[in-house]
């Protein structure tokens, strides 16, 4: 999936990107770009989501990694963007709490779930929680609220403590996704990342879940194809 989450770099026409077979596009507003979002971009985003080449709305969400000062504008922008949600099109969420605090992470997931339920009451909405690092209670909360919630895992699993490991183990096998998040994250071996390195993510996930990497890889691919209706 090719993700365009900076309004300034959205493609003019996603259908003319000439992507390789099997690739598709997501468009959204990363929370760090929330300040740039306005009426002009809202209208553009609405039109882009009508393109048959666009398969998802995202990334959208809340990112407190640079402090809480921008939380208000990020929250307002998220509420606004969620007005464009469509049940047949997955929402890709990006959540990051301030600091390395597992309790703050789980609290952020709970807070945004409440906001999402208010703006997107259709519980048939498909959801992809990108780079998920919540606990098992968070998995249950989102799954109960939106049964179509999928949980994505990247090379970040190599640094998981007990709490997010419990969350990873609690994810149903048919709701687990694998992510490279390239080029932003290094892969689990510390190399420059690429979607072709996804097997290394599968190995990291498999170690936590006590499964074979090949089974994890097969499940992740099948789940991604089903979620994005690309099979």
What are these regions (language model features)?
Residues 1-231:
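Mid-domain alpha/beta scaffold segments of enzyme catalytic cores
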């Amino acid at each position: 999936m090719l993700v365009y989450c900076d309004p300034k770099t959205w493609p003019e026409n996603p259908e003319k990107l000439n992507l390789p077979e099997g690739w598709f596009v997501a468009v959204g507003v990363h929370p760090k770009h929330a300040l740039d979002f306005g009426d002009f971009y809202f209208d553009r985003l609405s039109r882009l989501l009508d393109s048959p080449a666009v398969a998802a709305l995202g990334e959208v969400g809340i990112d407190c990694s640079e402090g809480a000062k921008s939380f208000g504008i990020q929250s307002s922008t998220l509420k606004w963007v969620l007005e464009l949600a469509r049940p047949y099109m997955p929402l890709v969420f990006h959540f990051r709490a301030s600091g390395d605090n597992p309790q703050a992470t789980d609290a952020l997931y709970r807070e945004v779930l409440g906001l999402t339920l208010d703006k997107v009451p259709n519980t048939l909405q498909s959801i992809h929680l990108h780079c998920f690092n919540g606990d098992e209670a968070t998995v249950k909360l989102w799954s109960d609220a939106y049964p179509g919630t999928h949980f994505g895992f990247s090379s970040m699993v190599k640094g998981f403590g007990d709490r997010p490991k419990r969350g990873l183990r609690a994810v149903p096998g048919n709701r687990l996704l694998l992510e490279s998040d390239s080029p932003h994250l290094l892969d689990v071996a510390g190399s420059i990342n690429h979607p072709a390195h996804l097997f290394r993510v599968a190995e990291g996930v498999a170690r936590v879940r006590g499964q074979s990497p090949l089974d994890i890889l097969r499940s992740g691919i099948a789940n991604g194809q089903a979620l994005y209706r690309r099979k």
